[in-house]
Regions:
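A conserved structural/catalytic subdomain of Rossmann-like adenosyl-cofactor enzymes
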Residues: 1-168
Length: 168
């Protein structure tokens, strides 16, 4: 089923109960996070939830969570969503990973058991353990210092008082 991502986050007790009810009757095979522009102009963040209907979800079932936001389609002004040269290869890679023909890095696919309380999205399960490049690190430090300076200039320096450390 193609649904908004908010349908699989399950933040409220009612949403968690719905997800629990679904798992009692159906097996979640996986969720594919789609490009935010898949339904260009609608303003929803879509995903595809794949179920095996009529079979209760086993507690130890490993589900696939795939980040397919980079699907090879781009928005063009006045034309909408257009296929790029990479679209076919990316779709084939998605299918190869889904059907277990190739392994994928965890930044593309995470396989794990789930519970109704979990967010059923790749971003919930993915942990980026890559070391940042020097450029990325310097940018992050620069962004933080800019933020801190801005807060101090707005009279909110107290937010940082307990976190000051002396650099020798």
């Amino acid at each position: 089923v193609i649904i908004p991502q908010s349908s699989v986050t399950g933040k409220s007790n009612e949403e968690r109960a719905i997800k629990k009810s679904i798992l009692k009757k159906h097996t979640l095979e996986g969720v594919i996070t789609l490009n935010k522009d898949t339904f260009y102009g609608v303003g929803t963040m879509p995903c595809i939830a794949v179920f095996t209907a009529g079979e209760p979800h086993p507690s130890n079932k490993e589900c696939k969570f795939i980040d397919f936001r980079e699907d090879g389609y781009k928005v063009s002004a006045h034309k909408g969503l257009l296929e790029t040269e990479q679209a076919k290869d990316r779709k084939q890679h998605l299918l190869d990973v889904w059907f277990g023909r190739v392994n994928a890095e965890s930044k593309f696919c995470v396989k794990t058991a789930i519970e109704a309380e979990d967010e059923w999205l790749h971003a919930f399960f993915y942990f980026n353990d890559e070391l940042p490049t020097d450029v990325e690190f310097e940018k992050t430090i620069g962004d933080f210092l800019t933020f801190e300076f801005s807060m101090i200039m707005q009279g909110r320096g107290y937010l940082f008082e307990s976190h000051k450390t002396e650099i020798i």
